[in-house]
A protein has these predicted regions:
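Short alpha-helical functional segments enriched in proximate histidine and acidic residues
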Residues: 42, 113, 145, 223
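Hydrophobic alpha-helical bundle segments that form small-molecule/ligand-binding pockets
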Residues: 138-187, 224-227
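Alpha-helical structural segments
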Residues: 33-45, 76-94, 101, 105-109, ...
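N-terminal intrinsically disordered/low-complexity leader segments
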Residues: 1-30, 195-203
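Hydrophobic alpha-helical connector segments
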Residues: 91-137, 163
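Helix-turn-helix
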Residues: 34, 38-76, 80
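A structured, mid-to-C-terminal "fold-capping" secondary-structure block
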Residues: 181-230
Length: 230
């Protein structure tokens, strides 16, 4: 399998496919791609809390039972959405040969895409990649890059999992409240932590989540880089 191609421009828009008339699609176009398009449209309007199979059926102008001819559950629809979103994760730098920069680009892109879709993370974190073509294309590109960089084959998947675990947690951090580490009335009993939080605030970073992500990612790169063959 060849490496994934350049990431499309809009990671949160409709899935690629033939354009249709404005308005609800006819039942004749109901397929997995059409379901993915409608699911993204519904999520964009109502968020994940408003995403139900009944609401999706209304968006598609079909009976709920018609959906189940193509997907067996809401989870299956989320799998389709996840696979579509994964196609917007940028893995093109792995073709250039600079492993560290490729991992940086991949990790930042991965985090940015899924920071807007954190309700999917508990699903995809335990989701088999079987029959998810865009997800598998991403992993193939990353694995090929790791292999070319001199990683022992048996270390490639554990290294990817380690980085992904960090990415998924960091995606939540992007939308965390600014006062998440405010110790409040317990400041006196947690002086070291409170001082560290205050010192970070004094740095005046616009995006503290980016500071943490950069620090953690560079530490991962340094540690994992030691596994590469000389």
């Amino acid at each position: 399998m060849t490496a994934a191609t350049s990431a499309p421009a809009d990671p949160h828009g409709p899935a690629a496919g033939p354009r249709r008339r404005a308005g609800r699609p006819a039942a004749a176009v109901l397929d997995q791609n059409g379901i993915t398009v409608a699911a993204l449209e519904l999520i964009g309007k109502s968020g994940y809390d408003g995403f139900t199979m009944a609401a999706l059926a209304r968006t598609l102008n079909v009976a709920p039972s018609a959906l189940y001819n193509h997907v067996s559950s809401k989870r299956d629809v989320l799998v389709l959405v996840q696979d579509h979103l994964t196609s917007f994760v940028d893995v093109t730098a792995f073709e250039a040969g600079d492993w560290e920069q490729a991992v940086r680009d991949w990790a930042w892109s991965y985090r940015d895409v899924f920071s807007k879709h954190t309700p999917l993370i508990p699903v995809i974190a335990v989701l088999p990649v079987t029959d998810a073509p865009k997800t598998l294309a991403m992993y193939e590109a990353v694995s090929a890059g790791f292999s070319r960089a001199g990683f022992p084959q048996e270390r490639i998947v554990p290294a990817i999992v380690a980085i992904e675990s960090f990415i998924f947690g960091s995606a939540y951090d992007v939308t965390a409240p600014a006062d998440i580490f405010d110790s409040g009335t317990m400041a006196a009993s947690t002086p070291h932590f409170t001082a560290a939080v205050q010192r970070l605030a004094e740095e005046g970073h616009d995006k503290p989540a980016d500071v943490a992500f950069r620090l953690g990612l560079e530490a991962l790169l340094a540690g994992l880089g030691a596994l590469r063959a000389a």
